Regions:
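Start-of-domain marker
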Residues: 1-36, 49
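Surface-exposed peri-terminal alpha-helical interaction modules
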Residues: 7, 16-18, 57-59, 78-84, ...
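Acidic/His-rich structured neighborhood in mature extracellular/periplasmic domains
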Residues: 31-146
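Solvent-exposed alpha-helical segments and adjacent loops
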Residues: 86-95, 99-103, 175, 179-183, ...
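Phosphate/adenylate-binding glycine loop and adjacent helical scaffold
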Residues: 115, 119, 179, 200
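Alpha-helical segments in soluble extracytoplasmic regions
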Residues: 122-194
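Conserved small/polar residues in nucleotide/adenosyl-binding loops
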Residues: 206
């Protein structure tokens, strides 16, 4: 409800254009109201003129420690972060929106990726919150935000658009052209791997 009942973008989506997203929290340790957890995020968008979906994000974040009391409402204010749990959820909402909009227009998701970065900037001031610090891990939220914005990501984001919009979305109308475009787009991943061997774009497909 926290995600579904909030408007995250000014864009209007038709029913068949909506992003299918699931976030699953895996609790590893529990001490009263303190949770040591992981969160699995999966998101898919429809492929144009088909019954298929394509994966936008399939990522396991292994650093989610938070405090939560049963029945406590989740709340988010863009100017203030009060919970590591809500901050993490909001961060991935913006990452998903960024990847979705990138798949429809070249770097079309920049605004949302920048909003995800803003969450990182704010969360870093909370010393007890895990998953936000630079150099703690090459697969945490800081790493995801950085990977989507550094110079090496340009090739990835261009590939992302070409693969989805000019490739998959063309398959119904012209399968040969769509397939050729997809094959031609994939070498860009090697560019990212060469420039940033430990990038989360390689490890976690963020």
């Amino acid at each position: 409800e926290f995600v579904n009942n909030r408007k995250w973008t000014d864009a209007t989506f038709a029913v068949n254009e909506k992003i299918d997203c699931t976030m699953t929290i895996i609790v590893n340790e529990l001490d009263e109201t303190n949770f040591k957890s992981e969160i699995q995020i999966q998101a898919r968008r429809p492929v144009y003129n088909s019954s298929y979906t394509t994966t936008l994000l399939n990522f396991r974040d292994q650093q989610l420690d938070f405090e939560y009391t049963e029945g406590e409402p989740l709340d988010y204010n863009s100017n203030t972060l009060t919970s590591n749990l809500t901050a993490t959820i909001v961060f991935y909402v913006y990452v998903i929106l960024g990847l979705d909009f990138d798949s429809f227009a070249p770097k079309g998701g920049t605004t949302y990726i920048q909003q995800a970065q803003q969450i990182v900037n704010m969360a870093q001031s909370e010393m007890s919150w895990t998953g936000w610090k630079a150099f703690d891990s090459n697969q945490n939220r800081h790493a995801v935000a950085t990977a989507l914005q550094d110079n090496a990501s340009d090739a990835f984001r261009e590939m992302w658009y070409t693969y989805h919009r000019k490739g998959l979305d063309e398959m119904a109308a012209n399968p040969d052209r769509g397939r050729t475009t997809i094959i031609g787009a994939l070498p860009a991943l090697q560019e990212v791997k060469k420039a940033r061997p430990t990038s989360v774009l390689q490890i976690g497909r963020a």
